[in-house]
Amino acid sequence: MRQFKVSHPGEMIARDLEDMGVSGRRFAHNIGVTPATVSRLLAGKTALTPSLSIRIAAALGSTPEFWLRLQSNYDLRQLENQIDTSGIVLYGESNEQQQNAQEH
């Protein structure tokens, strides 16, 4: 199984806010969500939603698509680290290779 380490978008936002000297509470107030929501996001404990991505993009000068791509990439890597695909036969291989894989 392949292992990938990709940062949660919230962790990236946390670093950006720290660099700018902006607290999570202040950021939450600015984007119109609860401090608890931002706290969970910055800790990587909750996914970035489309609604949050719009608000975050407006506050940080980026696009919602950018943040959603980061979240999607993070989610995909997490699943790739959890799902064992070693027993799945690749279609399109020669019949002999498929039969050998099925026998093992």
Swiss-Prot record:
> Which InterPro entries does its entry note?
Cro/C1-type_HTH (IPR001387), Lambda_DNA-bd_dom_sf (IPR010982), Toxin_antidote_HigA (IPR013430)
**Keywords of this protein's UniProt record, alphabetized?**
DNA-binding, Plasmid, Toxin-antitoxin system, Transcription, Transcription regulation
Locate the site labelled Interaction with HigB. Q3, F4
- DNA-binding region ranges: 24-43
> SUPFAM superfamilies attached here?
lambda repressor-like DNA-binding domains
Report the Gene3D superfamilies cross-referenced here: lambda repressor-like DNA-binding domains
Single GO molecular function: DNA-binding transcription factor activity
One Pfam family in the UniProt entry = HTH_3
Q: Which GO terms describe its biological process?
A: regulation of DNA-templated transcription
Q: Which CDD domains match?
A: HTH_XRE
Q: Which residues are in the HTH cro/C1-type domain?
A: 13-67
> What's this chain's function?
Antitoxin component of a type II toxin-antitoxin (TA) system that counteracts the effect of the HigB toxin. Binds to its own promoter and regulates transcription of the higB/higA operon.
Quaternary structure and interacting proteins, as annotated:
Forms a complex with the mRNA interferase HigB which inhibits the mRNA interferase activity. The heterodimer dimerizes to form a HigB-(HigA)2-HigB tetramer that is able to bind to the DNA.
Matching NCBIfam families: antidote_HigA
UniProt protein name: Antitoxin HigA
Q: Which organism is it from?
A: Proteus vulgaris
Coding gene? Answer: higA
